[in-house]
Amino acid sequence: MLIDVHCHANLYLAIDQIIKESRSVGIEKVIAVAMSVISQERIVEICESYDLFFPALGIHPEEININKEIEKEIDSVIENILRNKDIICCIGEIGLDHHFIKDKENYPLQLKIFKQMLTLAEKLNLPVNIHSKGAEQEVYQTLTSYNLPNVNIHWYSGPEKFLMEGIERGYYFSITPAVKYSPPVKKTVNLVEVDHLLLESDGPVKYSGQIGRPSMIKEVLNEIAKIKNVPPEKLEVQIYNNTKKVFPKIFAI
């Protein structure tokens, strides 16, 4: 009953091995999350080829920094999302980044594209998978202008002030394998109630030198269970039900 709600499946070279590992530890579903223009079609292709994966399409703020043609290409990205609206389960990974991306000249375009992605999510009545590193205040301010079915803040490690604001708004928070060693991620787990927690690998991001894989979310579940002092079996059911609320389309497609 384990579900990885945030994984960049297009970046794996040995996708068959990833699937085998995932199945072996009870991973039932994985949301494959796009980041770049070039990843959009590959994500859809993977999800059409392997029933473990479900597509999420969107533009990551890092793409604005890397792809100098993004402003010209964004219309084609939007068209692709609309073309695949029946199969995508959320809009993501989208958001703002003022931590890793230091060039402030890119911030206005980040915000413009973030708003375009949120407009799409609102139009399609889809949840969003949010990146907010170093830009928590701006992300939260922007989200207030949109009527979205659900918001998942992925790998939150920012100020407690905005964590508490997100909790008050009813946002969900997906937890990565970094929970095993990261004080900010442990704090997120401590403060967020179990009925608003989700699991993610963010693979293939590395954790202590190991490539992140969906199979790792079993360890994430066990670590959360320790922190929350909840039996892992009970927590697994709770988080599964949380996932059904946030991403209902992966259970209907």
Regions from the language model: what does each represent?
Residues 1-253:
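Mid-domain alpha/beta scaffold segments of enzyme catalytic cores
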